[in-house]
Every structure is written in C-alpha cells, then in structure tokens.
C-alpha cells in the first residue's frame, strides 16, 4: 500500500513537470528553417514602438526598441540583427518608410537597409561617422534622404551608398528637431531655435526663420501648412508664402480631422504612396 502511494505521488509529480514543460515550450517562438534572422511569434518583439508602416501588400511593419516586426494579420514575423551582412544593421529600429517604388526602408541606430522579397536586408553603405539614422524622407523626384542629428545623407542608387550632403544643420544645445519635405520639394528642418528650408534639388539653404516657444513637435499638413507646437502653444508656418500665421479653421481641421477627411497628427506620421 505504501509503495502504491509513493508510485502515485511520483506519477503526479511527473505529470506536473510535463505540463510545465509544455507551457514553457508554447511561449518559445518558432524559428523559421529558411531564415535565420526570422522568428515567428504571437507577440510583438518589444513594447516600445518607434515606427509603423504599411507595405504594398497591406502588411503592417512595426519597428521597436528591440527588433523589427511584420504583422500579417495572424502572427508577427520578427527580424533581428544577426552576425550576417544580410540582416538588420541593429535591433533598435528608428524609422520605417515605404517609398514611391514600394520599396521598404528600415532605419536603425547603426545604419539603414532595404528589405528584400526573399526576407533579407540590403544594407546601405554610409560614408560618414554618424550612422544613427533618425528619419527617412523622399521628394517628388524620388530622391531618398537619411537624417541624423548631425548630418543629412542622400542615397546614391548606383553605388548603394549614403553620401553626406549637409552637416551641422542643427544648432548647438539643440536636442529636439524634426524634418519634412513640402509639395514644392523644399526640405524644412525645425529645431528649437529656427525653421530652415533647403531646396532638395541642390540642398541649398533658401529660407531661415527664428521660432518661438522652443518647438517639441511639428506636422506638415496638405504639403504646405507646417504646424509647430511647443510649451506655450502652436505656431503655423506656410511653406508656400513663407509667412507665419494661422486661422481658427486650420486649427479646427486638426481638432476635428474626420470632418475634413484627415487623420489626426498623433496617428498620421507620414503619408504613404498608394500600392
């Protein structure tokens, strides 16, 4: 009788261990056999989301503090930096952008790359020391630009290289800035102290205006209305007339975007070209 009781206790213990092992195994993402840098999971790789973009197939790409995620409607395809030149340059994603040719660009704190149809990444060679790409932009002519805190790079299709075109665009002691390209292909860099306009054709500085209230965020609406917000309110700069101004109607469009067919700035980071 005593042996039987011990036997049953051992069976119960083994069953409990087996259930625990199965539960732990369920939480381990499945590794694809075809792509070493791809992990399949029911969860996003990291909760700190840095950028979101939709590709031409309607799949949602999410860049996080640790890893790149592609959500296909059922599960997350997670991409990581691996010891391979065909992988991501770094796990810390800063920006994702779909250009006019439906190519998907991924920027990281240590470089930028193009996603390939086979699941690999084509890394762009950078001829500068600062590889922390914070934003990817494109003008109407299809020119691709990469912005860092210190430099502006332009992509050379022939050599797959990012070439420095501008340096020291941001003033000293400025740790917050933003950048937009308007409908006339002028690149506007908003810093804590000024708004600067560069013609994308030759990146010549054509406009520089001081700003107030130390801007912390900006948003380009309709290709020419540059809204700049700071601690003391909001300013409106028209990039067509290059004058400061504002109207209750314009502010109303931001406050109630559904009535005007617009997305709110907090959820519309950039317009993406149609598929």
Task: List the model feature ranges, each with a label.
Residues 2-275:
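Carboxylate-rich, polar loop motifs that coordinate divalent cations or form catalytic acidic clusters
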């Amino acid at each position: 009788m005593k042996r039987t009781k011990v036997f049953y206790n051992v069976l119960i213990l083994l069953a409990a261990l087996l259930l625990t092992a199965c539960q732990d195994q369920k939480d381990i993402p499945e590794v694809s056999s075809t792509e070493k840098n791809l992990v399949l999971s029911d969860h996003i790789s990291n909760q700190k989301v840095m950028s979101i973009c939709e590709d031409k197939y309607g799949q949602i790409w999410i860049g996080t503090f640790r890893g790149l995620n592609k959500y296909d409607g059922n599960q997350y395809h997670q991409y990581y930096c691996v010891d391979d030149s065909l992988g991501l340059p770094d796990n810390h994603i800063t920006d994702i952008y779909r250009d006019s040719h439906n190519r998907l660009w991924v920027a990281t704190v240590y470089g930028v790359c193009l996603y390939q149809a086979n699941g690999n990444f084509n890394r762009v060679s950078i001829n500068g020391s600062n590889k922390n790409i914070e934003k990817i932009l494109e003008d109407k002519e299809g020119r691709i630009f990469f912005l860092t805190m210190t430099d502006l790079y332009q992509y050379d299709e022939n050599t797959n290289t990012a070439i420095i075109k501008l340096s020291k665009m941001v003033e000293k002691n400025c740790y917050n800035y933003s950048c937009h390209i308007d409908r006339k292909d002028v690149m506007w860099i908003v810093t804590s102290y000024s708004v600067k306009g560069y013609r994308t054709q030759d990146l010549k500085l054509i406009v520089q205006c001081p700003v107030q209230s130390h801007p912390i965020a900006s948003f380009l609406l309709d290709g020419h209305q540059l809204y700049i917000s700071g601690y003391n309110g909001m300013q409106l700069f028209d990039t067509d007339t290059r004058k400061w101004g504002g109207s209750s109607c314009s502010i109303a469009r931001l406050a109630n975007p559904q009535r005007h067919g617009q997305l709110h700035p907090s959820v519309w980071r950039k317009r993406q070209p149609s598929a």
